[in-house]
Amino acid sequence: PASVGQFSAVGYFFGRMLYKALGIPVGLITSNWGGSTIEAWMTVDAIDATPGIDHAVAKSGTYDNSIPQRLYNGMILPVCRYTAKGFIWYQGESNRKNWYDYKALQVSLVKLWRETWGDGKMPFYYTQLAPYRYEGDTLRSLPLVIEAQYRALAEIPHSGIAATTDLGNPTCIHPA
């Protein structure tokens, strides 16, 4: 419909699928910012509590969408009092520089969000990064971020991942 033009396509189609499966209206809240890093969606305390990561790199964001805690404060906290039954997440492209920390950061993010909503079992589903044609070092780091996403899956209960390797459009970073 025309009313969803600015809404996340992934979020819209996921919500539509839920509606068809459940047969009841489904409300969706979108909190997204293109090109953001995972650290921006976390508190500084959660980053500090994440073991084994390069904390200096994790806290080195300089743009609004990469500054630790900026998007958590501005886009997560304002909606955390709403009833929610789960999360979907499609992010990671901007963490190619610190792919080696992505698994630990994603595990910590899920823990933080579940604590924020007061439900340690809230489902968390996410999308594998698409096979986009990056260049140079970022081309080499893409499969490493994807591997980190799958390794995180093994440590996050009540979670799932949507594979995108079969989409076959290397010129579109977010294929629909």
Which stretches of residues belong to each language-model region?
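Cell-envelope and extracellular/periplasmic
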Residues: P1-A176
